[in-house]
Amino acid sequence: GHLDHVGAVKPIQDALRVPFAIGGGDRPLLALLPEHGLAFGMRGLKTPTIDLDLAEVSAIPFGSGVIRVVKTPGHTPGGCTFLFGDRGEKGLFGDSLFHLSVGRTDLGGDADVYARTIRDVILPMPDATEVHAGHGPSSTMAVEKRDNPFLNGQLDIGCPDLPM
């Protein structure tokens, strides 16, 4: 629910009458959108209406298939990753995973939750899964497992007693 991902949702929602989905854990962040906008010099940001709480679903119909909704909290409480393809070959990770990095936790996130998400949810994903992040270049899980210091144990995300 950070500004850089949801700041333009309300005017789009109003103009196009499209639904908005977000992980329910991000409701408090979303409620602060107008204030966060002011902190970055953006006046008049409005909080969008949530039409679908992603915490309540595991899949969303899409064309002739489905998008798998995988809960990946840590960067934000309601963080989700979206997997496409029969075996989740393509992933939209938002800020849960970047090429050679991960999202920050100091704006409503939780480093310990994030470390568990990495260990229990992200690391088990197949090596062939394409990683499309909210910022920066794309990658694959194989590259991230090998080279990302937050995934391969070189850097600690904030929970030193949690074995990765």
What is the role of each PLM region?
Residues 1-65, 146-154:
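Active-site HxH/HxHxD metal-binding segment of metal-dependent hydrolases
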Residues 32-40, 59, 66-71, 76-164:
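Metallo-beta-lactamase
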